[in-house]
Amino acid sequence: MKPYFSCVFVFCFLIKLLTGELNDLANHRMFSFHDGGVQISCNYPETVQQLKMQLFKDREVLCDLTKTKGSGNTVSIKNPMSCPYQLSNNSVSFFLDNADSSQGSYFLCSLSIFDPPPFQEKNLSGGYLLIYESQLCCQLKLWLPVGCAAFVAALLFGCIFIVWFAKKKYRSSVHDPNSEYMFMAAVNTNKKSRLAGMTS
């Protein structure tokens, strides 16, 4: 009985896929990073001829692009907010330059379709963009070798100081005049034997 249900499920999935009811617009990669900026891609169906694409940052309209066809198939593009964009047959890409952590937020693409009729409004895709500060990473890259070199130098200096101090302490304890042991002078054995011969 289970193989029957799995076959029915696979068959229904293939029918949805072939008829285009499966919406793959939300499965695209929305954010990509280029040269210190962020590219936000909003996809739409290729059959759309006239559209209005809006990029929302939370509830604020950040970018607004309208593509219409006039007489003689002339394409008119209006970009009242002067957002840098790139338009293709099935997507609009908006560019946010000099991305920093203050631009991290929830972004949403909203599509209004004028042609082909009927008029439709869709929220296509959304995602949360979190930008980490890259300057902190660069500072860490600089300070990491400097910190390691300073640590090695301090360790080397400490070892040299300990060895020097140990040698100094050893030398001072050997020649200490206040020691209870007296230094013995070297005795010449030849003189000793002569003295021994005189007494006998």
Swiss-Prot record:
Pfam family for this entry, one: V-set_2
Transmembrane segments: 146-166
Compartments (UniProt record): Cell membrane
Disulfide bonds: 42-109, 63-83
PTM notes: N-glycosylated.
Membrane topology value: Single-pass type I membrane protein
Tissue expression from the record: Strongly expressed in the spleen and lung. Lower expression seen in liver, kidney and testis.
Glycan attachment sites: 89, 123
Job description of the protein: Stimulatory receptor expressed in activated or antigen-experienced T-cells that plays an important role in the immune response. Upon binding to its ligand ICOSL expressed on antigen presenting cells (APCs), delivers costimulatory signals that enhances all basic T-cell responses to a foreign antigen, namely proliferation, secretion of lymphokines including IL10, up-regulation of molecules that mediate cell-cell interaction, and effective help for antibody secretion by B-cells.
Quaternary structure and interacting proteins, as annotated: Homodimer; disulfide-linked. Interacts with ICOSLG. Interacts with PIK3R1. Interacts with TBK1; this interaction is critical for the maturation of T follicular regulatory cells.
PANTHER family tied to this protein: INDUCIBLE T-CELL COSTIMULATOR, INDUCIBLE T-CELL COSTIMULATOR ICOS
Protein name: Inducible T-cell costimulator
Native source organism of the sequence: Rattus norvegicus (Rat)
Protein encoded by which gene: Icos
